[in-house]
């Protein structure tokens, strides 16, 4: 079982959060994969979180990811009035090869999807969406994918699955499982005219950064109807980013909210 490959959440992080007595926070709501207690019972979980640091096929320059920084800030937030169970299953270590990581992630996604559990993945690079997509191979319906990104990732000049070619690989996949693909937040000067022509030829929807900034409601029905939502942090606008234009934090929260309101048990990839 690939769940056994997951490493527990850092005890140092959990102890630090516990010492801060975060009353009413997500930290007190979530069941954690810990050294002593092991993996939580996923059969009673509605949402599972895993961390991934696989970026070897990113295409883009990637820094070493400290997923606990994101966890620390996330778990400080206050819980809502929901009746859902959340489990943090820990981190998936890199395999000996990228393909090993893909295979392990494929198995994890397939198991959780069979139990109708929403999976939130933090970390990794865009190419991990490919094994997530492949995990739908026995799913009766076709798959809708939404990518919140400043580029389309439709490069065709490589046989390797990477952060710039993964969507082209999905489109050409023999399974013919892709129903629809939508990009939200693309920036024209970062996308080749060939990619734009291909998006139009395949009747895939694209919403530019300017369009989504003016009217975020355009994205709501699309995201809520998605099976896979990928949110690439390079689409964000923040100090120090090599691309100063992008989605601001308020809009990022709105788009993430739409993903959380989906009834399709989606996979949400927060790609760093």
What are the functions of these language-model segments?
Residues 3-49, 56-270:
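Conserved alpha-helical scaffold segments that buttress catalytic/binding sites
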């Amino acid at each position: 079982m690939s769940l056994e490959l997951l490493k527990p959440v850092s005890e140092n992080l959990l102890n630090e959060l516990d010492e801060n007595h975060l009353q009413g926070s997500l930290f007190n709501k979530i069941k954690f994969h810990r050294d002593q207690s092991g993996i939580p019972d996923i059969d009673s979980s509605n949402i599972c979180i895993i961390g991934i640091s696989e970026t070897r096929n990113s295409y883009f320059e990637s820094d070493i990811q400290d997923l606990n920084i994101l966890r620390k800030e996330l778990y400080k937030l206050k819980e809502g009035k929901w009746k859902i169970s959340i489990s943090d299953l820990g981190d998936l270590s890199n395999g000996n090869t990228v393909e090993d990581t893909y295979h392990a992630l494929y198995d994890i996604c397939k198991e959780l999807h069979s139990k109708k559990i929403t999976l939130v993945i933090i970390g990794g690079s865009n190419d991990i969406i490919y094994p997530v997509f492949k995990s739908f191979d026995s799913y009766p319906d076709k798959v809708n994918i939404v990518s919140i990104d400043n580029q389309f990732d439709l490069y065709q000049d490589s046989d390797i699955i990477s952060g710039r070619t993964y969507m082209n690989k999905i489109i050409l996949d023999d399974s013919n499982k892709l129903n629809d693909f939508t990009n939200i937040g693309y920036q024209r000067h970062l996308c080749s005219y060939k990619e734009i022509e291909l998006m139009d030829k395949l009747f895939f929807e694209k919403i530019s950064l300017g369009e989504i900034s003016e009217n975020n409601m355009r994205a709501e029905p699309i995201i809520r109807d998605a099976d896979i939502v990928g949110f690439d942090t390079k689409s964000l606008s923040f100090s120090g980013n090599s691309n100063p234009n992008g989605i601001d934090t308020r809009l990022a929260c709105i788009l993430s909210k739409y993903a959380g309101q989906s009834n399709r048990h989606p996979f949400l990839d927060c790609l760093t």
